[in-house]
């Protein structure tokens, strides 16, 4: 059962990366189209921060998910990585979509664009298949067990 859950979690994380990418694209385009207080949103430093932070969230999520899928594909023990993406990716999606909503203003929470649905979906994923706290405990236990056995953690190459 855990193998099926693991593959499902990877699938949901890959889907979340795609949704983050879409929200990011919408946010950047909106910042280039929207004028506020005599200037375009894309000239504002807070928007630069939103773009940079979202870029990092998406890249980290994408790379963590790919790494996890590679471990699974090679038949390795991916339990810790599965728990890590289960915690990190939905939280990152929540942050990226929240920033996109901020850039869109009231339009961001309307049914006219998909951001409000993405926001709800991201929050729901943080509860599905066990809350974040359970997975954090599993990550810590797996890491500590390896160190207690005289090993260190291999983050890959």
Regions found by a protein language model. Give the residues of each.
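Alpha-helical interface subdomain recognition
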Residues: 2-157
